[in-house]
Structure formats: structure tokens, C-alpha cells
């Protein structure tokens, strides 16, 4: 990551405040004099797909990130945006990290406006990496493998990491910091 690169960190349902790894990543980038945006998306505990898509479009237009790091529902949000005809007007980003994407057929009432979600044809990123856990309650490894195959992207499967969030012990997470900050 060069000093000029801008990193946008997008949380999932409920946010990703400290001690979540996304909050730690934002702090690590800032401590290294990097440029980071870690916005709180509208009504994160009761999200609306349409409101989040609109907000993300505004963020992309204003911030113009080089790298985007999505956790959970933020990955689904990215899929929805990539399926929009107006996405072609937004410049392709350099890197996209998708951590713990939920199944595209997730059935949870509070986030039902996001599902089912069709996988986009294009992720609008030059490099994409997906990281999941083998015991994530929101996606099976088989579906993650299918997604990775469709997009022809690398998939990292971590053992017993749950939903890769603070509840499963992922506060400071060196792997994602190293990948995003290009130390690996």
C-alpha cells in the first residue's frame, strides 16, 4: 500500500466498532499515516439495502478509494452495487477484500432486504481476495468455494474462526493488516 492509497473499510450488520478487527485495521492504517475511511453506515442494526447502496455510492464518489475491505453484509452490499447499471461509471478499484461474506440466500428477518442476492458478473476490482472460516454460521465453505471459482479469486479458509469478528476472537488481526498494508 503506498502512502497515497486510500482504504475504505465497510462494516456489516451491527457495525464493527472496537474491539472488532476492522476498527483495529483502521487504527493501524492511520498510525502508519495512511488514508482510511471507516464510516458508520446508516442504521447499522436495522439496515436497509437501498439506503446502504445510496450511502455507499456517495462515499465512493467523495472518497475515491483504492482498496475496499468488506466484512460480512458489506460484501453483499458490494455485490448489489456491482449489479447496478451505474456501477460502470465508478472507476475500478485496485484491491477488494471480502471477509466472511454471508450466503447469498441468507434468511434473517432484520437484513432480509439484502437477500436473496445475485452474484455480479464483475467485482470492479483489479485484485480480489476472499477470506472465510470453516465454521462460519452464515456461509458454508462449499458456497464460498463456488463464489471464489466464479470470480477466479483466491480463497483463504481459516479453521474455527466463526464469523471472523470480535465475538470469535478477531480483534487485532495481523493477517488482514499485513495483506491490506502489503506487508505480505
Where are these regions (language model features)?
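Active-site catalytic motif of lipid deacylating hydrolases and related acyltransferases
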Residues: 3-64
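Catalytic histidine neighborhood in serine/cysteine hydrolases
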Residues: 34-37, 148-165
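Short beta-strand/loop motif that positions the catalytic acidic residue
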Residues: 123-125, 129-132, 136
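Catalytic active-site module of serine/aspartate enzymes centered on a nucleophile-bearing elbow/loop
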Residues: 169-184
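Catalytic histidine-centered segment of alpha/beta-hydrolase-like enzymes
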Residues: 47-49, 161-173
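Conserved alpha/beta-hydrolase "acid-adjacent" motif
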Residues: 107, 137-143
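Active-site nucleophile loop of the alpha/beta-hydrolase fold
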Residues: 12, 40-44, 96-106
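Gly/Ala-rich beta-loop-alpha elbow adjacent to hydrolase catalytic centers
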Residues: 68-79
